[in-house]
């Protein structure tokens, strides 16, 4: 069985490095010289678990030698049909001479794992498509799928005694879910991002389009602002024809939404943390590099296992700071704030919304990427991708290049030989000429958000806004108002308050892209939007979300009334109802009654009972952080 390490014998218990041994269930780790089956050895050694071994033989373990010595690698694919992020029949260029149709990336990984002399076990977990559910009741199920994914992967990895895990997510909540699972099971781990979609093109608009175009077009359609360009092919086309054209061509194939929306925000941040292979976040789903990455991941996970690198070894404070820096540089989604807090909470790394604010105060915004810019992830891929950006930031001292990664090398070593950004490219501005001197994500506080709120303000919309409150209890009420055309430019500056959409109140903290995009499409630049819900990574404009405490638990947002004057200031980081003093708030509080729970049973009812607040990541297994 191999030479035993000093101080260890087969079956010895080795502490796995958790901060609190009672936080997560502890498993025996067998440290045997030259063997990588440190957890599966529990059920495959000798004849202690004959039933388990019989089942494994039945599942495909070929012989006794593999049973006793081969490590078990779980391959977790977050997949379902009906979503291009998960599109299954991918035609992938595997080399320069031929194509091969594969069911999914997991099959490539499994085959490559087996080539390394290990046992690959595929399993699946699920999510929902934000773009499909946006604006409807289905969106309430979105955020809680992050917890389902983390719970599912933790369950299978631990119960099946896997020695390592390779996770393959492809959509917004998928990625933080896999990282949270990795922090829980703390076994050798690599994430493979499913990859970005290519941009679409509308002949009637004569420009590139993407999923965000669909939602903004709806606002333009409602306010009679959607028209075809004047070209021979557009003669006689109606606004409805233009909307048809957009819907049919916005998503031309496989991959996650192509701007610097939530999926690409999380993928790039996780690469900056060292938890995926170099280039993973910027390789398009249908690129030949993505298929080759799946093959390389099997080699890399073996190195990770041999070196004994654990997710918590990599998920350091410095790694999270790298993630925050890159998110500010690229103009990433506000959802990143929520997910970074949840990931850090799970890994017991102290991280707060104040850390987000400090990073934003010192890091410039450089990327001309959608939704606020004109380029897409595929464009960044063509000029060097995420590693080229990281190389620039390491050289400038903005990213900590000493953090260890899943390659077994440091981040600086990973990007050292990567091409530098072409000085003539237009996507990433030089540090000397940023789009904005500080980050686009601001943490606001004030009498409407004493525990914090998250604003996405690029500067294009200005840095402060004052308007008259117009209050909506649920997004649907605002959607009805927008559809009726009752939000008008001639009404003056308006601050639209959408409340009771937080983690508990929604429940599920749904994204408000339907509303925010409709406002942009309608050209309503006299409007700011404030909510205790979330925004899609595709949202832009003067938007404030994640308001804490949320309205459903009696937060000040529940006490705002139509006609109150609200000021939002991204320079002082304040959000206040300026004409409502504390005495008036107390009078209103006495009259306020908590709404009945929107849902009592099922997965959303359970979620509403368990979930913590957004300022701590909205996690369900620990409402308050341990620091």
Name each region found by the language model:
Residues 149-162, 244:
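An acidic, phosphate/nucleotide-engaging active-site surface
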Residues 147-148, 191:
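Acidic, His- and aromatic-enriched active-site or binding-groove loops in soluble protein domains
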Residues 84:
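Classical protein tyrosine phosphatase
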Residues 156-178, 190-192:
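A short, small-residue-rich loop immediately preceding and capping a beta-strand
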Residues 149, 175, 512-515:
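Amphipathic coiled-coil/heptad-repeat helices and related helical stalk/stem segments
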């Amino acid at each position: 069985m191999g030479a035993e390490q000093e101080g260890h014998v087969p079956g010895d218990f080795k502490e796995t490095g958790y901060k609190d041994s009672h936080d997560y269930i502890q498993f025996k780790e067998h440290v045997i010289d030259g063997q990588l089956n440190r957890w599966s050895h529990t059920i495959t050694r000798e004849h202690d678990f004959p039933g388990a071994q019989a089942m494994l033989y039945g599942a495909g373990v070929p012989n006794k030698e593999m049973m006793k010595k081969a490590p078990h690698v779980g391959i977790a694919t977050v997949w379902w049909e009906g979503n291009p992020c998960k599109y299954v029949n991918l035609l992938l260029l595997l080399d320069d001479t031929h194509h091969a149709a594969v069911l999914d990336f997991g099959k490539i990984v499994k085959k490559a794992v087996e080539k390394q002399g290990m046992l690959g076990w595929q399993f699946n977990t699920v999510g929902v498509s934000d773009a499909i559910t946006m604006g409807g009741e289905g969106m309430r199920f979105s955020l809680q799928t992050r917890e389902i994914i983390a719970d599912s992967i933790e369950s299978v990895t631990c119960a099946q005694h896997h020695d390592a895990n390779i996770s393959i997510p492809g959509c917004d909540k998928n990625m933080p879910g896999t990282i949270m699972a990795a922090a829980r099971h703390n076994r050798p781990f690599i994430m493979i991002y499913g990859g970005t979609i290519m941009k679409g093109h509308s002949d009637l608009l004569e420009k590139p389009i993407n999923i965000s175009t669909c939602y903004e077009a709806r606002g333009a359609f409602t306010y009679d602002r959607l028209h075809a360009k004047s070209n021979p092919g557009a003669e006689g086309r109606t606004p409805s024809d233009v909307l048809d054209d957009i819907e049919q061509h916005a998503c031309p194939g496989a991959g996650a939404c192509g701007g610097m929306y939530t999926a690409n925000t999380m993928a790039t941040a996780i690469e900056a943390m060292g938890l995926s292979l170099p280039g993973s976040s910027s390789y398009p789903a249908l690129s030949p590099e993505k298929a080759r990455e799946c093959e390389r991941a099997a080699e890399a996970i073996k190195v990770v296992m041999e070196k004994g690198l654990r997710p918590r070894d990599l998920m350091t404070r410095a790694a999270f700071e790298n993630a925050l820096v890159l998110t500010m540089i690229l103009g990433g989604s506000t959802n990143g704030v929520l997910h970074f807090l949840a990931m850090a909470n799970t890994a017991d790394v102290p991280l707060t919304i104040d850390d987000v604010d400090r990073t934003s105060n010192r890091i410039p915004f450089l990327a001309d990427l959608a939704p606020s810019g004109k380029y897409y992830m595929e464009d960044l891929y063509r000029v060097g991708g995420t590693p080229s950006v990281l190389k620039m930031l390491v050289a400038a001292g903005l990213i900590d290049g000493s953090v260890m990664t899943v390659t077994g090398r440091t981040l600086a070593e990973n990007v050292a030989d990567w091409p530098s950004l072409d000085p003539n490219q237009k996507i990433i501005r030089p540090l000397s000429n940023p789009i904005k001197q500080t980050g686009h994500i601001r943490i606001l506080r004030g009498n409407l958000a004493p525990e914090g709120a998250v604003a996405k303000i690029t500067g294009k919309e200005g840095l402060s806004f004052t308007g008259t409150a117009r209050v909506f209890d649920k997004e649907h009420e605002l959607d009805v108002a927008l559809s009726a055309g009752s939000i008008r430019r001639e009404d003056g500056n308006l601050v639209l308050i959408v409340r009771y959409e937080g983690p508990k109140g929604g429940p599920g903290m749904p994204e408000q892209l339907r509303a925010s995009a409709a406002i942009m499409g309608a050209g309503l630049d006299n409007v700011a939007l404030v909510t205790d819900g979330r925004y899609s990574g595709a949202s832009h404009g003067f938007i404030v979300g994640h308001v804490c405490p949320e309205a459903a638990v009696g937060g000040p947002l529940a006490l705002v009334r139509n006609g109150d004057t609200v000021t939002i200031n991204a320079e002082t980081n304040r959000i206040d109802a300026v004409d409502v003093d504390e005495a008036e708030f107390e009078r209103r509080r006495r009259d306020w009654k908590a709404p009945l729970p929107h849902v009592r049973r099922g997965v959303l009812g359970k979620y509403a009972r368990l979930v913590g607040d957004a300022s701590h990541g909205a996690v369900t297994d620990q409402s308050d952080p341990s620091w």
